[in-house]
Amino acid sequence: MKFIKIALTSLVIMTGVSLSAQKKIEKFEKLEIEMFPKAKEGYKQVYIQLPIAKNENDLKVEYFVGADRMVDCNQQSIMGSIKKKDVEGWGYSYFDVDSKGESMTTLMGCPDQKKTKKFVTLQPEITRYNSRLPLVFYIPKDLEVRYRILKPESDLKKATHK
């Protein structure tokens, strides 16, 4: 009898875990990127699939294209540009990154010359949040895309005047 109780309890727990895992999977729209062009030579296609969220109009996505580099105390960034392009006939957009991965840096003196690993990026950009379509990027093979979700802090506040 004790064995049956343990077996039933285990079954209920496993079913609950399975259902919660399914719910997590169902929070994403079906990924469809076949209509996007193939990456050109020396580039790769990467994408961000955003989960379904409440009030998506309130959210933004800030994305960073860059690479881990060993840097000193100077401010560094990667030279290049990000152009938003459209998939012909579909009305979908993607981001094409044009960069050779070269860095520009300030020229401050760094007395200890201690280098640390840091994610060095092109100028970050912000786009609207849309869980129905992936954010597709074409980037040089030696770069990567990282992102964060920007959420409103609170209700709107009024500006003051003199």
Can you say where each PLM-predicted feature lies in the sequence?
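C-terminal partner/receptor-binding element of secreted or periplasmic proteins
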Residues: 128-162
